[in-house]
Amino acid sequence: DLGFLAINNNGNKLFKVYIGGGLGQNPKTGVALDEYCNPNEVLNYVEAMVRLFIEEGDYQNRAKARIRYILERMGEEEFKNCFKKHLNAVMSEDKLNLNIKEIQCEKEGIKTEREDIRLVEQKQNGLYSVYFHPVGGQADLKILRNIVSAIESMNDIELRLTMTEGIFIRNLNGKEAEELLNITAGCGGETKLEQSVSCIGVPVCQIGLGASQSMLKNILNYFKEKNYTKDILPSIHISGCANSCGFHQGALIGLTGKKKKYNDLLEDAFELHVNGRFSEGNAKLAKVYGVLLAREIPEFMYELALKVEEKNVPFEEYAEKFEAEISELVGKFN
């Protein structure tokens, strides 16, 4: 509905603003506004979108009560002009501006020679971030306590939650980074596949169709049984239903909960989405390849990994060049 992308415009830290997108049923990519947003004005944009929906939203059909359908009805230019009208009205009231102060980290860095997929070197010399990804976003309380206990005695530490169920522990010097890597080793995802994303799903979610957490665990367990530890497949994004809480429609590999009839019985299944992207200037929705039985998906993912490894290319390139091979593999399991 409303997205902010941080940019550096000739030395000015601003946001590029996207409006009118959305996932779920009938997903759409958003459109970019022509003007950039100052960080202290973001709440004005939020209020403007609220007012636009109040005035233009569909109150008769709940299935159409989404911003993207207003964009579809109006067309891009009229929709953008309508938003700007509401934005100008909100800005003229001058009630929602923020006072944002940039925080500078002056901590002295220490270099480390350690190499790890979860270790990220920051712009500041000798400072690092350590990424911790609880499998399925389900963090063990003991591990969290160990992290808190370690960072309590460290200076200027920040924790940043990600949109992919992970945590960046920031502003660590080299020695501190090594300590955090040791504390979190084996406690979360180390490969991209182990860093997959899953909504909570059945049985917790009341509207979900698929047991997304169980699906993820079954995939990872299958790879462990095969002793396959190569970092070949990307993170899989799993949603228990079409609402896309797991962001499956924008992922390189996505699954969404379904039901499928097999031998006259209704079984748990997931719809397969491949090659979605949400990078700047290259956003696209994933292609749907079909519906697979949940019990067969771990084997499917394993065979897919073998095919990608055989081609010796990154998965992004494989998904672009070998669509027919993916379709053939899906057909094998249908």
Language-model features, listed with the residues they occupy:
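Small-residue-enriched alpha-helical segments and adjacent helix-cap loops
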Residues: 1-12, 44, 134-265
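Structural signal for hydrophobic packing residues in well-ordered secondary-structure cores
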Residues: 46, 50-57, 83, 87-91, ...
